[in-house]
Regions:
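Non-globular, low-confidence helical/coil segments that flank catalytic cores
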Residues: 1-337
Length: 337
């Protein structure tokens, strides 16, 4: 595991440099991505994310925020030294994680509210996403997908391959097509790998897409390392998967640096045995303040504490930024702590 630099920091200002007219003239998503998806290896394929430029969003145009620049509670890219970042975005009672390295950027889930998501992306200067990975169809993970249309340019949307034609996911496919300006959603399966600069996202499970419910959530292993070199840091992204779903992968995954806790820290999100094997230094929970579900539960917080994890929650900390380097993982939170 990489050493952890957990000194949370504030950044006083987010400056937005480009005018609203720029986004009208953005080019279409890179064709190389479509070519890369055209050939599938027998057990494993790599989906190369070539990297759109992550240009600053224009606050007045996209989010309607006034007086954002200079706010002491906002975290800007660069508040951690590395360009390689995984950011648990504060989207209320939902999940959205931004993975970026230089010009490459991928979003894992979107949360529910398009306005909230766009504000979160604006805080980090993101106007283009090479891909959006949807763990499952629930509105708190996929509800904001269609809201990206015409605002944030999206190269690809990926769901489980079994859901590309499934009746249960007609609305999800429609939202994806809207975000993709009429293009189609694409399928992934265990063994597929999405690359984001020096990051790789390997799909571990499930084998079957099911009905795209919580238990059918896509579980991704996020790894960071120098290209062609050894893995320097690892994280497990579980969607709304809980103990039963984590049980299918945790022994193969082994020691990780951070865990994106499943199902917003629900009662059965993770157990002591899984924590003993995974040993995450950080546990990230996407959760809304004062939610009606009691998330995160005291039971799960106790499991995480016994497992030695530092718990960071979007309801308390806002956006949680992990900055990766060959030496350490630096942690920055929007609200401090």
């Amino acid at each position: 595991c990489a050493p952890l630099d957990a000194s949370a920091s504030f950044v006083g200002a987010v400056f937005f440099l480009l005018g609203a007219a720029l986004w009208v003239f953005w080019p279409s998503p890179l064709e190389e991505l479509d070519h890369a998806l055209g050939r599938r290896a027998a057990a494993r394929r790599t989906i190369l994310v070539c990297g759109f430029a992550a240009l600053p969003l224009v606050v007045a145009l996209l989010t309607g925020l006034s007086g954002v620049a200079g706010s002491a509670n906002l975290v800007a890219p660069g508040s951690v030294a590395s360009d390689a970042q995984a950011v648990m975005l504060d989207v209320g009672q939902g999940d959205a994680m931004l993975v970026r390295d230089g010009d490459a950027a991928v979003l894992v889930d979107t949360g529910e509210d398009p306005t909230v998501l766009l504000k979160a992306l604006a805080r980090h200067g993101v106007t283009r996403l090479d891909a959006v990975l949807i763990s499952h169809k629930d509105i708190d993970h996929a509800g904001a997908l269609s809201g990206l249309a015409g605002v944030v340019q999206v190269g690809h949307v990926y769901i489980h391959k079994d859901l590309v034609q499934a009746e249960c996911c007609a609305q999800l496919r429609s939202s994806a097509s809207w975000a993709l300006s009429g293009r189609e959603v694409e399928g992934v399966a265990p063994g597929d790998v999405v690359t984001v600069g020096r990051f790789s996202l390997s799909l571990l499970s499930p084998q079957n897409g099911g009905e795209s419910e919580n238990e059918d959530s896509l579980i991704w292993l996020l790894e960071f390392g120098e290209k062609g070199g050894r893995v320097l840091a690892k994280g497990l992204l579980t969607g709304d998967g809980e103990q039963a779903e984590v049980a299918a992968v945790f022994e193969d995954v082994g020691d990780i640096d951070f865990l994106k806790v499943g199902h917003h820290g629900s009662r059965d999100a993770v157990n002591d045995e899984e924590m003993r094997v995974l040993k995450p230094e950080l546990a990230l929970i996407g959760v809304g303040a004062g939610n009606d579900y009691g998330h995160p539960t005291e039971q799960t917080l106790g499991v995480l504490e016994r497992g030695g994890s530092k718990v960071l929650r979007t309801d308390l900390h806002g956006d949680i930024t992990l900055g990766f380097s060959s030496e350490s993982i630096a942690v920055s939170t929007q609200k401090g702590g």
